[in-house]
Amino acid sequence: MWLKTAHRFIERRDDAWLRLTLPIIGLLAIASGVGIFFKGFYRDTTYYSLMAVGQDFFSFIVVVPTLAIAALMAHRSSLRALFVWLGIVIYLTYTYAIAAFDNQFNALFLVYVALFACSLYALIGGFLGLNKDGIKARFTERTPVRAISLYLGTLAVLFYLTWLREVIPAVLTGTVPQSVKDSGTPTNAVHVLDMSWILPALLITAVNLRHRRSLGYLLAGPMLSFIVFMASAVLCMVISMSRAGYPLVVPQVILFIATLAVSLGLLIWYLRSLRVAAADADESQRCA
């Protein structure tokens, strides 16, 4: 009965991808716990280290339990939880790609590599197992298609303009962007991942959702979930730096609070517009 119910929105339910949540949680608890409880662990610049510690607090306190709950509910055939789980896995893939490539080498290097690998394959497997046409059929007419597509498209364009405004002058003048100087890394991995992966994904989602294509419905939830977690992490980084004496950039704080609020609101609206089949509800209660 459970397989028949789940097949409506998943082509082939392979819990191997959800089971990767266990090693991810264990590795994440180690990586973030060491960053929090071992002062001076990071060998990076003060600026970069403070951001890393701020993100470690967020990962340890928020991401670990939320990922566990989302995985458990997704295992019990909750499509809403699966979308949130995918968003968190995108966030972790992004975060630990940066840690593995940009952090100064330390005792957790292999942990970063393992986190990146587990998150990446969980993400690929999670998406490959989904039937995008079946998912589209689960959404009602109340789905905020235009609002989400406009928001994601606008966000992508604004961040492209922000990063290019920093990168292009440096390329033309043969200098180094300020963010690269502050982090003490060869390049800014955020520039790389945003402009090559995240921002194109937001644009693809926006265009497909605007035209009510199945791919847009499939990607919108995970991308909104990713933005919620990423904006929250950035705010934790800002708090960490502020506590260490760095000046608080008020416009930046306002921007990320607004991004978090709008993304969370649209994510809730999007998830609430999902039809919950009676069979799904019955099965979830049976699993409980």
Model-found features: residue ranges?
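Short, Lys/Arg-rich, polar N-terminal cytosolic tail immediately upstream
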Residues: M1-R13
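Membrane-interfacial loop-to-transmembrane alpha-helix junctions, especially the N-terminal start
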Residues: W17-R19, H75-I88, L215-S225
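Alpha-helical transmembrane segments of multi-pass integral membrane proteins
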Residues: L20-A31, Y91-Y96, Y112-N131, R142-P169, ...
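C-terminal transmembrane-bundle signature of multipass membrane proteins
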Residues: I30, H191-A288
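A loop-to-helix transmembrane entry motif
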Residues: S49-D56, V180-A201
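Hydrophobic cores of alpha-helical transmembrane segments in multi-pass inner/ER membrane proteins
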Residues: F58-I69, L115-G129, S196-I204, A258-S273
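Membrane-interface helix-loop-helix junctions at boundaries between adjacent transmembrane segments
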Residues: I69-G125, K132-T143
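Membrane-interface interhelical connector segments
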Residues: I168-T185
